[in-house]
Design a protein with these regions (language model features):
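Membrane-interface helix-loop-helix junctions at boundaries between adjacent transmembrane segments
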Residues: 67-82, 89-146
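C-terminal TM-helix exit segments that contain a strictly Trp-centered aromatic cap at the helix terminus
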Residues: 78-96, 215-233
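Juxtamembrane "helix-exit" motif on the non-cytosolic side of transmembrane helices
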Residues: 26-34, 60-63, 91-98, 163-172, ...
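Cytosolic juxtamembrane helix and N-cap/initiation of the first transmembrane helix
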Residues: 1-17, 135-154
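Short aromatic-rich membrane-water interface segments that cap or initiate transmembrane helices
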Residues: 3-11, 103-118, 144, 240-255
């Protein structure tokens, strides 16, 4: 395992997971504020997210400390479960109980609770668990190498983000050619990781995976700029403040893509 800028790979992984927690909490706040926090369960991602953030930062500062590692594993597991429960809530209240139910499935997927969004909390929780265990010196978890598990989590997360992007960009009628980028690049990056895991000694597989993960990382910042531009194009633009944020493309979503790309690069090169 190698380091970068004085930090080991697992420390970087934990800090990136903490950043992911911040971004997903911001995104969740916008969505739940839009719906008026009509359910108490809508506060759950913030409780779980804050605990995850604090434990991830703490164990990244002092890796290997038993108490901090235990706390990080506990909060990571809590976040993983909270994300799964949240996905169930989004499914129940966003599809099942809506008029038309599954007969209006596409309508509900486009205009109600985003079905895959809660899984971002599960992804962050999983990465914190893996980062904490790896930072304490463990090579495996549940019988599998931690590096493989990290790359597996990143792969699944990239596919989920591609699916969610496809839904939301379809809702936006793909009015900009750049809206196709995450729908194309993220699955390619996920596929390249699978290729690398299937043929770890293949230089081409590793190089292509690295290139596509860099494209994912940099593309996330480009997407964030375009989402801000989308906010400014609303009536009244950014001067509308909260109204612009609520009704415009989610500003933090592309940054989650960048964080996942960085997490994949950390696993590829530093673990």
């Amino acid at each position: 395992m190698t380091g970068f800028l004085g930090l080991a790979g697992f420390q970087w992984l934990l800090l990136l997971a903490a950043l992911q927690a911040v971004l997903l909490m911001a995104d969740a706040f916008i969505g739940h504020y839009r719906s008026g926090f009509s359910l108490r369960a809508q506060y759950a991602p913030f409780v779980s997210g804050v605990l995850l953030l604090l434990s991830a930062v703490a164990v990244s500062i002092a890796p290997g400390r038993a108490a901090l590692t235990t706390a990080a594993v506990a909060t990571g597991t809590l976040a993983l479960l909270a994300g799964l429960v949240g996905a169930g809530y989004h499914h129940w209240y966003g599809i099942t109980t809506k008029p038309g139910g599954y007969r209006w499935l596409l309508h509900h997927l486009l205009h109600h609770a985003p079905p895959l969004a809660p899984f971002a909390l599960s992804v962050a929780g999983s990465l914190v668990v893996l980062g904490a265990r790896g930072g304490s010196g463990a090579d495996q978890l549940l019988g599998a190498p931690i590096r493989l598990l990290v790359l597996g989590v990143v792969t699944v997360a990239l596919l989920g983000l591609a699916g969610q992007s496809a839904l939301l960009h379809y809702r936006g009628a793909f009015n900009q050619p750049a809206m196709y980028i995450p729908v194309i690049v993220l699955p390619l990056a996920a596929g390249s990781i699978v290729w690398h895991l299937a043929a770890p000694s293949a230089t081409a597989a590793r190089g292509i995976a690295a290139a596509l993960l860099w494209a994912t990382f940099l593309g996330g910042f480009v997407g964030a700029g375009m989402h801000l531009r989308g906010m400014d194009r609303q009536m009244g633009g950014l001067a509308m403040g909260v109204a612009a944020v609520i009704d415009a493309p989610p500003p933090g979503a592309p940054l989650l893509v960048a964080v996942l790309g960085a997490s994949g690069l950390v696993a590829l090169h530093l673990l």
